[in-house]
Design a protein with these regions (language model features):
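Active-site region of the double-stranded beta-helix
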Residues: 1-28, 43-84, 91-145, 151, ...
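Glycine-rich, charged/polar anion/phosphate-binding loops
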Residues: 34-36, 106-107
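Short, charged beta-turn/beta-strand-edge "cap" motif at the junction between a beta-strand
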Residues: 38-41, 165-168
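Short small/polar-residue motifs
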Residues: 105-107, 163-166
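Glycine-rich, small/acidic residue-mixed loop/short-helix segments
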Residues: 172
Length: 186
């Protein structure tokens, strides 16, 4: 990892990726929070659930020389913009493992719940369960299928639930991520 912006730019221009990047082993069920301004990439075979602030900006420094299917050219990179926005030196971040608890038929893993940033839980349901969440939430099915309050959901689909809906009742065998947000420290 580069210790200064000058070193970062030098290693980038020389394409010395092994000096510039840290490669992390991805544990099954591991969680990692990647703060804004952190240079990162997702390796082959890794399933991610990305939650980000309201922004329509992605800057690329390196893109594995992938071809854009619509233009048939290499995807654009923006090294100068990256140099201006990346955190240098960067904080060392690692994958974390969180314990699960069993609540009303759901295996619940609470990954993150930071006011002003995001909330992320994992709910694993085997046949039946229920869960109470008092804020709006997006429930995304990452494995299996079932219903949420009678609404069908299957892998790759998301259901939005407004705030103050009360208990969510689940039927089926499914693995869900619950993503939400809160302003206050409650």
């Amino acid at each position: 990892m580069a210790g200064s912006k000058e070193e970062f730019i030098e290693w980038t221009l020389k394409k010395e990726w092994k000096k510039l990047l840290r490669y992390l082993w991805t544990p099954v069920d591991g969680f990692i929070n990647i703060p804004t301004g952190t240079l990162h990439a997702i390796g082959k075979g890794v399933l991610t659930y990305n939650i980000s602030r309201n922004a329509d900006l992605t800057l690329r420094l390196y893109d594995y020389d992938r071809i854009d299917p619509s233009t048939h050219k290499k995807r654009e990179i923006q090294p100068q913009e990256v140099f201006e926005n990346v955190n240098i030196p960067d904080k060392k971040i690692e994958f974390q493992m969180f314990p699960a608890s069993y609540e009303f038929g759901c295996k619940v893993t609470r990954y993150w719940d930071e006011p002003g940033l995001y909330t992320l839980f994992r709910l694993q349901i085997d046949e039946n369960g229920k869960f109470l969440h008092d804020r709006f939430a997006f429930y995304t099915c990452v494995k299996g299928k079932g219903t949420i309050n009678g609404i069908p959901i299957r892998q790759g689909e998301t259901v939005f639930v407004p705030a103050c809906m009360g208990w969510m009742y689940f039927k089926g065998n499914m693995d869900l991520f619950l993503a939400s947000y809160r302003n206050e420290n409650v």
